[in-house]
């Protein structure tokens, strides 16, 4: 199974390491044509506005086509990229996930945190690393909330798309990546 990790900027290598430990064949995606080689895509954390600049209009459109039709997983900035609506400030998202997300909603870098929260994945509580994290302010009717922080969704799934506002790749817990790989294998939303 070939999994792409968008490797333009951000913490793409941490995702690569987790995915390889779980047995995936990882492609570091740096060009739009590489999207044709993969079965699923991870969009890592980083800076969403930088992703937009580096992708350009044509690259963004190729990304949008991929994430709206194939299994995709975004963390932090990647979740922003997958969103239907982005605020603080407003910017475009791919619309692959019916969420409204607020950039940097949990504060500046100094307010980053490592917290433990309940999640509905098998195994119970999960350690979650937040770094200038976005907050999901609203979810559409087809979005399943898998974990929350202070009443706000932090891990969500809709069809073939999974998003986390935290960084599961920075912990030893691989459950979120395992779920994504299951989604890719199943070609859909998978099972918990």
Swiss-Prot record:
Keywords: Glutamine amidotransferase, Hydrolase, Lyase, Pyridoxal phosphate
InterPro entries tied to this protein: Class_I_gatase-like, PdxT/SNO, PdxT/SNO_CS
The protein's assembly and partners: In the presence of PdxS, forms a dodecamer of heterodimers. Only shows activity in the heterodimer.
Active-site residue list: 76, 167, 169
Taxonomic superkingdom: Bacteria
Task of the protein: Catalyzes the hydrolysis of glutamine to glutamate and ammonia as part of the biosynthesis of pyridoxal 5'-phosphate. The resulting ammonia molecule is channeled to the active site of PdxS.
Protein name from the UniProt record: Pyridoxal 5'-phosphate synthase subunit PdxT
Keyword GTP-binding recorded: no
Catalytic activity: aldehydo-D-ribose 5-phosphate + D-glyceraldehyde 3-phosphate + L-glutamine = pyridoxal 5'-phosphate + L-glutamate + phosphate + 3 H2O + H(+); L-glutamine + H2O = L-glutamate + NH4(+)
Source organism (scientific name): Koribacter versatilis (strain Ellin345)
Similarity comment: family membership: Belongs to the glutaminase PdxT/SNO family.
Annotated GO CC locations: cytosol; glutaminase complex
Binding-site residues for L-glutamine, renumbered to this chain: 46-48, 103, 131-132
